[in-house]
Amino acid sequence: MADWVGPCSAGRKARRSRASRDVAGTKQTSALNQEDASQRKAELEAAVRKKIEFERKALHIVEQLLEENISEEFLRECGKFITPAHYSDVVDERSIIKLCGYPLCQNKLGIVPKQKYKISTKTNKVYDITERKCFCSNFCYKASKFFEAQIPKSPVWIREEERHPDFQLLQDGQSGPSGEEIQLCSKAIKTSDIDSPGHFEKHYESSSSSSHSDSSSDNEQDFVSSILPGNRPNATRPQLHEKSIMKKKAGQKVNSQHESKEQTVVDVIEQLGNCRLDNQEKATACELPLQNVNTQISSNSSLQKKLEASEISDIKYSSSKVTLVGISKKSAEHFKRKFAKSNQVSGSASSSLQVCPEIAKANLLKALKETLIEWKTEETLRFLYGQNYASVCLKSSSTPLVKEEELDEDDMNSDPDSHSPALQELNSLDESLPFRASDTAIKPLPSYENLKKETETLNLRIREFYRGRYVLNEETTKSQDSEEHDPTFPLIDSSSQNQIRKRIVLEKLNKVLPGLLGPLQITLGDIYTQLKNLVHTFRLTNRNIIHKPAEWTLIALVLLSILTSTLGIQKLSQENVMFTQFMTTLLEELHLKNEDLESLTIIFRTSC
């Protein structure tokens, strides 16, 4: 028993010692882990502090670059501690405070354009000027971009171990672009592209390339005539396919029998080439051979078409420098597609002819007269001249009416047809007849049977009425007053089209009136009430309120002229020298005369 207890106690002691050693090791490892964690935490905090310090330094540099009088050496040193994002912030902040975005430039920004793109007529290119608007000149824009491209893109807190770049600054005298170029066309069209458009098919025939490739046949290799501008001494000739060469050989065998007739066509073409000169004698000498040849080849329509085509091509393109080149149908279609836009632009430029100033002036006055006549109503005349507007309008319009009547009588008397004996006999015959012919349609006569039945019915009704047996049916008549109608309310101002049109007219007049009233030292408030009341009497439609600014200026002049008596302002009277000079100067700028303005104002002096 004692022997058994001894080993057990020894084993317990060994286990206890092992457990104590494990606990001690665990404490040591935990202590080491805590030390590592604290060390890593300290390193992380140091890295964060370093990062924050470099960022703070970069922001401080950005603030310093917003000031004036920046030297080149300071700018080179600043490039080592900032990123391109920091530099773009410098450019934006300087433009906000109306300074040039380039730190070395001390100029102030002037009027900044609002548009995003600019078309350069010097280089024929389109530029995006979003960034260019932050600089005072193209040189500053290019110099800023040149310096920004050298700034490293790596973070500022890891540049201690890197080698700092040697910054270079753009020297004066080197102009830059107007902005970022917009690529409207990937590649310019060349003459070689017309004959070999294979590499362009991906851009223009992406959807239909498969169908065209499947349906391509020998017809694509058939050659058609096409005109290319300019001479082509070094132009590449279109490469012929083997099938087209075989066709050409076969066509030569078939057309050998027509060589004699084609020879006459060649002779005629040579004679036409001689007729290109402006000498009239040579032209007359060529007329007789042409007539003979036309009679010879009248039997062959194909040769006649060739002759006509050659004549048209020789005569039409003799003055211009063009070259007749044979290209395939596929190339011809590609040629048309390439130059479709240019042809449209040239066609629109040639069609826009300059209109004669007199014609433009007449059209302007005609349109304004029609507008003012449509605007004028009886309420307008009553507002201008009072209740007795009829007498005032008749006096002012009596003389032109008499002239028109006299002109009509003279025209009637001077009509040559009225003196013809045939017309006189017809007029006398019409006067002798008890009735005259009318232009109305004549109704067809009723049938005899219907008339007979109606007569018998009428006689029967008369006899029955006198005997007292006939009773008339009471006709139920409904008065128009008894008809019930649903009451309708007038439209409110926000939905009334007439009110909206009046508001539009007043807005247009308010835009042009300050420019007219300013030189006369009259405020808009002096005439606005009367002008508004006058506009409310007009008959406005959706068509007679659409005018150009120059037309609205003339309309405002006319309305000011007719409101002179109503307003009672002496500055608007014709006796005022200042008003007269102002009107004369304004009409000269509009290429009009006082008579033209008078012809517009007289519309409101005549009755409706």
UniProtKB/Swiss-Prot annotation:
It is an enzyme of class 3 (hydrolase). InterPro entries: Rtr1/RPAP2, Rtr1/RPAP2_dom, Rtr1/RPAP2_sf. Zn(2+) binds at residues 100, 105, 136, 140. Keywords: Acetylation, Coiled coil, Cytoplasm, Hydrolase, Metal-binding, Nucleus, Phosphoprotein, Protein phosphatase, Transcription, Transcription regulation, Zinc, Zinc-finger. It catalyses: O-phospho-L-seryl-[protein] + H2O = L-seryl-[protein] + phosphate; O-phospho-L-threonyl-[protein] + H2O = L-threonyl-[protein] + phosphate. Residues 1-38, 193-262, 403-423 are annotated as: Disordered. The modification N-acetylalanine is found at residue 2. Its main location: cytoplasm. Its EC number is 3.1.3.16. Residues 33-68 form a coiled coil. This is Putative RNA polymerase II subunit B1 CTD phosphatase RPAP2. The gene is RPAP2.
